[in-house]
Amino acid sequence: MSKKYAKETVCIQSGWQPKNGEPRILPIYQSTTFKYETSEQMGRLFDLEESGYFYTRLQNPTNDYVAAKICELEGGVAAMLTSSGQAANYYAIFNICETGDHVIMSSTVYGGTHNLITVTMKKMGIECTVVDPDASLDELRKTIQPNTKCVFGETIANPALVVLDIEKFATLAHEAGVPLIIDNTFATPINCNPFEWGADIVTHSTTKYMDGHAMTVGGAIVDSGNFDWTAHAEKFPGLCTPDASYHGVTYTEKFGKGAYITKATVQLMRDLGSIQAPQNAFLLNVGLETLPLRMERHCSNAQKVAEFLENHEKVAWVNYPGLPSNKYYNLAQKYMPKGSCGVISFGLKSGRTGAGKMMDHLELAAIVTHVADARTCVLHPASHTHRQMTDEQLVEAGVAPDLIRLSVGIENVDDIIADLKQAIEKAD
């Protein structure tokens, strides 16, 4: 949209802009291929001389309309959808890294992302230094290497709920001449825009709050357009030197601020796949329309539930950035003054055993791997999502053995609290 609107309006009106007589609702372009009148025109598409669609493995109109909406919400210049949040994080890093390169990553990122970067990408020859997000800038500077290509972290860590000091990590990245990549899944662009604090690339698992209904798996990457790749051309040859697979095109020369997303789309998506299905993109768009309303309820419910847990005699500890007693309260107020997220972590005095018993007695909340949708759900990360990590890695990631991850939904908050109360009473 040409005019700048509030996020609530963007969520409804941005993306698909129907012309006279066209459908009011975003269409699903359920087609693998697209027809052209001449061979020459299709050839221009393959040479990147003309924009358009020819195969859904690379691009699809439904996806692009939804990506444009997310891009506007984040304040970026270009965006793309992927098949999952994991794919988004992989593409975001691999788009600028290759064998022999190095990544700096916050230790408290989601377990699947931790494994992706420290184990899977290591097999590709990409090394990673895992850092304490609370370390001083001077300590963090010691991890910079000549082959460092990016710094990676999460706005709010899953499930440790560590609030990243985005400005500190942006300073670290930019002193190293590399971009800061931030996974903004838990905060969503409704509560935080990392670009305003120095981040360069933002990723999302759209599976979570953006979809909001646990119906689709997907991811997104948004480029701020602020990082000057050409100023550090020697670090980023994939963007700043000719690509032999496209007749020698140099992305930064041909596409300017759109270089990063263009390369990820036409090169990585072409070679690796991982496009989001158009029907999933359509359902994601439906979720985005109510994202501001849902985030308001998620956050208000979570605040009340966290306060209940903090005052319960059988609860050993509670971690929620909205509590004044929380270690990250001030950072949360700085970066997310309207609210952080709907996820709480806590532990019972009965420990790890009590956690399992409590979860087994829940009646309203469900035990599921998922997090951040409309329904209240719980998980024991040490037994589930982080099961592949060693005890040392769990401690490093901020995942205590007794940690229960509670994703507070948008049901009536009194019903949520009543369910937790009866289950906790039966946990001994």
Predicted regions and their residues:
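Glycine-rich beta-alpha junction loops
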Residues: W16, Q30-Y36, G225-N226, L288-T290, ...
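PLP-dependent enzyme catalytic core of the Aspartate aminotransferase-like
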Residues: T118, E127-C128, K142, P146-K149, ...
